[in-house]
Amino acid sequence: MFGLEDVHSVVRAVEKHHEWLKKCLPMIASENVTSPAVREMLVTDFGHRYAEGKPGERLYEGCEYIDEVELACVRLAKELFGAEHANVQPTSGVVANLAALFALTEPGDTILGLRISHGGHISHHDISAPGVRGLNVEYLPFDEEDMAIDVDGMVRKIEEVEPSVVMLGASLFLFPHPVEEAVEAVEAVGGYVVYDAAHVLGLIAGGQFQDPIREGAHVVTGSTHKTFPGPQGGIVLCQRDLADDIDEAVFPGLVSNHHLHHVAALAVALAEFKEYGERYARDTVRNAKALAEALYAEGLRVLCEHRGFTESHQIAVDVREQGGGAVIAEKLESANILCNKNLLPWDDESKSHDPSGIRLGTQELTRLGMGLSEMEYIAELIADVVLGRREPSEVRKDVEELRREFQEVKYGFGSGVGAHEWPRLADW
């Protein structure tokens, strides 16, 4: 049974991943872990089915219950975010951004976004979604010391280039963005604000960051698996007058079948967030602030001390003096502390493989039930590695010991399956 041998090799790799992750501190800011209830939706028969189009207007038969689930998902999203319209069909955050750009722009238009070194996501740049749409990309002025958009400079830039879209939101996203100011300026030249909430969607839903919809953003996009601990996928929230344009951009424009098991899982995650979201988001930000303060006290160069370090789940650390982001991220991984190397504002964007910084996130540690005392201890462990006080192999033992106490998902529905446990369904 040669095919089964191949299956066994895959299964062994998956098993090793799960066993290893149980012993790690997952601090990559773009990840999270779903609850058992959400995870269960991902293995339903919905993953085998097709349902092109809108509920009630499908191109396939057999969608009665699929429609029921998608309508519930849309309703929950609108309720949770206070949105006039929601589309839950994008298969990723980048697809959600593409949908917004296809709905609001024409090829040859200009948009404004953040440089990658200033925290901007690649899907705001001509190498990604704007390039696919044939757009010209210019950059928002940025205050590197405050890690913030220069509001006066932004307004002048909008008046100068008259963009069709101003893209707010970021991949390195420490503080809220100036939504109201951007809306006022861009509406005067006939444009729109698209707020990419991928990283902070859960913080927004929990009322702990800013509220871009109430601040006037015309469209809010996001991925559903970062601070919002749902399945991997995307979402678009918008004002009612843009609903048809957004929906047509998603289907038939960008998505055919839209991964129905993810819609079911997202519906459960949205329901969870109505119950637990405010507390989870509050604790995530509280943990990030505590971790940043503790890292700074340990002697690390944490950005924006004068602003309280962060208002989100993220922390940025300048590790140039310790060898750079690539070296330090690798050393931390050797200690089972998982983060990512990250460009900082002064970095050459062509050297993203070896930037100055690392980015840390507290959203998954919080989901595991860790709190302020754990943040202080984790800061000590990180500093031990970054500052060379101990060998990563020695720190790894302490990390594994800490993780033994935190193996369950908190702030969610369902129990009986560990956070990073593989719920086996078949015998091999």
Swiss-Prot record:
Q: Where in the cell is it found?
A: Cytoplasm
Enumerate the GO terms in the molecular function aspect: glycine hydroxymethyltransferase activity; pyridoxal phosphate binding
In its UniProt record, which GO terms are filed under biological process?
Answer: glycine biosynthetic process from serine; tetrahydrofolate interconversion
Q: Which UniProt keywords apply?
A: Amino-acid biosynthesis, Cytoplasm, One-carbon metabolism, Pyridoxal phosphate, Transferase
Q: What class of enzyme is it?
A: transferase
Q: Where is this site: Plays an important role in substrate specificity?
A: 225
Per the record, residues carrying N6-(pyridoxal phosphate)lysine are 226
Primary location: cytoplasm
What catalytic activity does the UniProt entry give for this protein? 5,10-methylenetetrahydromethanopterin + glycine + H2O = 5,6,7,8-tetrahydromethanopterin + L-serine
Q: Name one GO cellular component term.
A: cytoplasm
Q: Name one Pfam family in it.
A: SHMT
Q: What cofactor does its activity depend on?
A: pyridoxal 5'-phosphate
Task: List the InterPro entries hit by this protein, alphabetically.
Answer: PyrdxlP-dep_Trfase, PyrdxlP-dep_Trfase_major, PyrdxlP-dep_Trfase_small, Ser_HO-MeTrfase, Ser_HO-MeTrfase-like, Ser_HO-MeTrfase_PLP_BS, SHMT-like_dom
Residues bound to (6S)-5,6,7,8-tetrahydrofolate are 120-122
- Pathway(s) annotated for this protein in UniProt: Amino-acid biosynthesis; glycine biosynthesis; glycine from L-serine: step 1/1
Instruction: Report if keyword Glycosyltransferase is assigned.
Output: no
The EC code for this enzyme is: 2.1.2.-
Q: What does this protein do?
A: Catalyzes the reversible interconversion of serine and glycine with tetrahydromethanopterin (H4MPT) serving as the one-carbon carrier. Also exhibits a pteridine-independent aldolase activity toward beta-hydroxyamino acids, producing glycine and aldehydes, via a retro-aldol mechanism.
Regarding protein family, the annotation reads:
Belongs to the SHMT family.
Assembly mode: Homodimer.
Q: What's this protein's name?
A: Serine hydroxymethyltransferase
